[in-house]
Amino acid sequence: MVRKYVVAPHGGRRAYPDISSALRAAAERRGPALIEIAPGHYEESLTVRGEVQLTGLGGPGSVVVSPPRGTVLDAFGTVRVRGLLLVGRDADVVDCLGGSLTLEHTEVRAHGGVCVHARRASLVTLTDSVFRYGRTLFAGAGGSIERCGFHDAADNALAVIEGARVSVRDSRFEGSRIHGVRVSDAWAELVGCALTGTEKAAVMADTRAELTMSGCRVDSVHAEAVMFIEQSRGLVRGLRVSDAEHGIGVASGADPVVRDSVFADCRDTGINVQTTGRGTFEDCEVVDAGSVSVFSTNGGAPRVNGCRVTGGNVGVAVVDKARGHFTGVVVEDLSGVALRVFDESRAVFEQTRVERCPAGLEVRGNGGTTAQLTDVRITGFDMAAVAVTGEARVTLTRVSAEHGLLGFGVGEEASLRVQDCDVSATRAGGAVAFGRARLVARNLTVTGSEAFGLCGTESAYVDVADSRFEDCAAAGVTFDESGGGRLVNCSVTGARGMGVQHNGRVDLVSLHTSLPVVERVPEPAPPAVQVVNHHYHGPVFNAAVHGVQLAWNNDEVTQRIIEPAPARATPGTTPRATPGADRRTIQELDDQNGATP
């Protein structure tokens, strides 16, 4: 039988003046107790033991329990709290030492402390409640949270650590100084939750955590919406992210599965996998990412299947010794390159479609940089569908490029292998090799190029067999400068341009064409022009010179004539000039850089 106790601030008939006195009375009688609390402000700390229910009478916030310092509610047993406002400072406002604790329609405010601390082996249920300023901590405990709000936490709004297991449904987290939810070496499930305004990752899984998210929304956060690190695992389904720095981040050995999620208007990246992180991303969409939509870097290795990238700058980037496997990816309407592989990275693209992007695939790096494309279609590009430079190695199988500037280009010391590929309706050419690059093609078809079909220039080597070049405006095949190679069983058809224009460094084996084949041996370079430099630093004399004054490099010359004073005549004599003293000419040369010998 449940005994009922009534608490009123000023006492009354059969009423207790404070909550603590009612708790003492219930403890003395033992058994289940229901304590009904009238509206008022109670400055006391509550210690609850046994099976007790505390219920506030009146509207929300009418029953306030707020001691000056310390814990507000210390619970051990089977405790239920309903309709109270608990306010504490510099301590755990609610501390569940063991047993079970349920908070319903309750508000907890922690000024400088923890809202709720669920300790090991306890079970805490939070329903229709609000938690402000402090974090809610499950340390080795079990818990369930439904329809709760977590506001303006000074650190993490909800922390699930040390093997705890917590399920969170239909709750909201906003304004946390660190994370909205942190799961560390524990298990947590978030269903239908909303997170906003966090200063770090809205949801963080670290230290081998297990995190499941379904139907959640994250917006307006300063860092990642969701972050998996340190070998954490989990499943994320139906996540909607907007206005985050990064949509989802994976690092340091973490390996989540992410499905059916949308990352929109991320300021930097949509999907970011780094530092040996992995992850499987299926049927996701990245919209208008500020920098890179899907980013694998520094040893990252994601698997991306059936995803769509729309708008933004760069579509998929695999850089800095990273890897990536991409299947069924659609990339469209970007302002930058669609696919990028740099710096000792390795990427595989299968059944991928690129539309309306300035460039298709861009590969650059040393010999450890590789890309493989199979069943890929690239259309509507402004530059090259495929561009390979450095020492990178790329293999194309059943790749089509249409309606752009250049189909396939390989330069410097890179290598490009082409098998069963098509290039059509390009403005500058079908395929080109330059520098000291190597292009090997089998069953390549180039149609409707406004310039050439195939070009080898500088010192490139081109090996093409069983290929067709149709209706190319300038030439089907052209070799310039020192470029060389061979054409085996190839055909050049059309009604315009030349069939083959070469430099004598290419082997033509079984060439089929009705168009002209022209050999143009490069003219030898003209001899070097002899350059004679004359240096005029002073006068040059070709014979003896006497009685001259010389000056050079002068900016100003001043000449002054000084007349001697007339001699006085004595009576009876006639004045006469003194020889050599009639007139004296003095030249003064005024130049800081001048010289007068």
Report residues per predicted region.
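Right-handed parallel beta-helix/beta-solenoid
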Residues: 1-28
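Solenoidal tandem-repeat scaffolds enriched in leucines and small polar residues
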Residues: 122, 130-204, 209
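Extracellular beta-strand-rich solenoid/capping regions of secreted or surface-exposed proteins
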Residues: 42-55, 63-101, 112-121, 365
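All-beta strand scaffolds that present successive hydrophobic residues in beta-strands
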Residues: 53-56, 79-82, 101-105, 123-126, ...
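Long, low-complexity intrinsically disordered regions enriched in small/polar
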Residues: 495-597
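Core solenoid repeat modules with strong leucine/isoleucine-rich periodicity
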Residues: 194-394, 402-409
